[in-house]
Amino acid sequence: MKQYGAEFFGTFWLVLGGCGSAVLAAGVPELGIGYLGVALAFGLSVLTMAYAIGPISGAHLNPAVSVGLWVGGRFPASQLLPYVVAQVLGGLAAGGVLYLIASGKAGFDLAAGFASNGYGEHSPGGYSLQAALVSEVVLTGMFLLIILGATSKRAPQGFAPIAIGLTLTLIHLISIPVTNTSVNPARSTAVALYVGDWAVSQLWLFWVAPILGAVLGALAYRLIGDKND
């Protein structure tokens, strides 16, 4: 049970750190952290939790990562559903805490997005469904390929969290304008269910695309990686 608790708290921290920075700090006039700050917040959230709970659960913090690790032969199917449930619940708990904080400011507007992921008119840059799909599939695929490589037996030990955190930062720098960056169904669900309406109606993409990308990334790594990994 400890590994499920670790995934709960790890995903809680990822959503609070990443989405919290987007909701509370990104748009502050003059002192706002902007896209770069949000990207760093997501990367740092994963990096810190990877060191904290990696030895307990592997610090997946993401249903797509869990699926990808299973496809890559690094994770048992029997633990897949409990991990995903723990991740989603942790994300939702963080979304609730973030809502309590954000709603304490006068003029707070939940309908403005609450760091939700979207496409079309709900894309930060007005990108289409097709662009959002390609972005999420490709970037999640590369994320999994790097995760599998960085955690392989041949990789330098102790550096995987840094590689993974920096990768997630780069992914956000690329795709915040496209979809607000998901690559993580739990992160998307964590805020979409509070916004409701369009955020929920578009949520399907941010489950389908990251999981598809994770599967493709894991299969790609199996082609180039060591079979004994």
Swiss-Prot record:
GO molecular function: water channel activity
Motif (NPA 2): 184-186
Spans traversing the lipid bilayer: 8-28, 33-53, 81-101, 131-151, 158-178, 199-219
One Gene Ontology cellular component annotation held by this UniProt entry: plasma membrane
Keywords, comma-separated and alphabetical: Cell inner membrane, Cell membrane, Membrane, Repeat, Transmembrane, Transmembrane helix, Transport
Protein localization: Cell inner membrane
Position of sequence motif NPA 1: 62-64
Superkingdom to which the source organism belongs: Bacteria
Topology in the lipid bilayer: Multi-pass membrane protein
One family name in Pfam for this protein: MIP
Keyword Nucleotide-binding: no
One GO biological process term: water transport
Principal location: membrane
Site residues by UniProt (Involved in tetramerization or stability of the tetramer): 19
Residues the UniProt record annotates as site (Selectivity filter): 42, 172, 181, 187
Catalytic activity: H2O(in) = H2O(out)
UniProt-listed InterPro entries: Aquaporin-like (IPR023271), Aquaporin_transptr (IPR034294), Aquaporin_Z (IPR023743), MIP (IPR000425), MIP_CS (IPR022357)
Chain's role: Channel that permits osmotically driven movement of water in both directions. It is involved in the osmoregulation and in the maintenance of cell turgor during volume expansion in rapidly growing cells. It mediates rapid entry or exit of water in response to abrupt changes in osmolarity.
Family membership noted in the UniProt record: Belongs to the MIP/aquaporin (TC 1.A.8) family.
Classification via HAMAP family: Aquaporin_Z
Oligomer and partners: Homotetramer.
Domain notes: Aquaporins contain two tandem repeats each containing three membrane-spanning domains and a pore-forming loop with the signature motif Asn-Pro-Ala (NPA).
Protein name: Aquaporin Z
Lineage: Bacteria, Pseudomonadati, Pseudomonadota, Gammaproteobacteria, Pseudomonadales
Gene (UniProt): aqpZ
